[in-house]
């Protein structure tokens, strides 16, 4: 895909941006690549690399959900910037081989292209929820299976010793 801003869109901490009018939130993301199909639709492409024993052929693990949300956010950003974007994006997964005798100054990869049909319909309501949470004086309830909530509670307990005069719940992070 040829576009004058392509290098900016690939750059971390710049990327493609969109200010959400209903919330005023600035959403941005740095895309890895963009392919174009015969219908002139853009396909968002995200490169991933790892070194796992098993062959990667699908994004079917719980921790892949973040990858999918990232793809859908990129699709949403390009749509909001006026581009015709296909629902299908691609993950190009490079899995470094572990079974070589020696590296000999090079890594060998098995590369798999994984199509993914994105659905960015969750993004608008999520931005509204984020705005509401940011403007609230209350922390959201801890979710049962949320790794971030567990981390927040752990950090809160550690930080409590720096605020000994405050009762639990009187500060940020739930401390």
What residue ranges belong to the model's regions?
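Short secondary-structure boundary segments
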Residues: 1, 20-29, 145-155
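A non-catalytic, helix-rich entry segment at domain boundaries
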Residues: 1-13, 20
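Residue-identity detector for glutamine
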Residues: 2, 69-70, 75, 144, ...
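Short alpha-helical "patches" and their helix-cap loops
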Residues: 2-4, 87-93, 163-170
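Surface-exposed loop/turn and secondary-structure junction residues enriched for glycine/proline
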Residues: 4, 19-21, 112-119, 137, ...
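Mg2+/Mn2+-dependent nuclease catalytic core
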Residues: 16-125
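Cysteine-cluster motifs in flexible loop/terminal segments that predominantly coordinate metals
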Residues: 123, 128-175
């Amino acid at each position: 895909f040829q576009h004058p801003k392509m290098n900016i869109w690939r750059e971390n901490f710049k990327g493609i941006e969109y200010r959400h009018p209903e919330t005023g939130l600035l959403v941005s993301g740095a895309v890895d690549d963009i392919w174009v199909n015969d219908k002139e639709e853009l396909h968002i492409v995200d490169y991933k690399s790892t070194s796992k024993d098993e062959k990667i052929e699908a994004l079917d693990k719980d921790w892949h959900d973040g990858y999918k949300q990232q793809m859908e956010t990129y699709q949403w950003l390009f749509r909001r910037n006026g581009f015709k974007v296909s629902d299908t994006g691609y993950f190009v997964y490079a899995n470094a081989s572990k079974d070589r005798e020696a590296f000999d100054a090079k890594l060998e990869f098995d590369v798999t292209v994984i199509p993914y049909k994105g659905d960015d319909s969750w993004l608008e309501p999520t931005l509204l929820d984020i705005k509401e949470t940011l403007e609230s004086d209350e922390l959201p309830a801890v979710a049962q299976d949320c790794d971030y909530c567990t981390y927040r509670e752990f950090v809160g307990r550690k930080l409590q010793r720096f605020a000994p005069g405050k009762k639990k719940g009187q500060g940020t992070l739930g401390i």
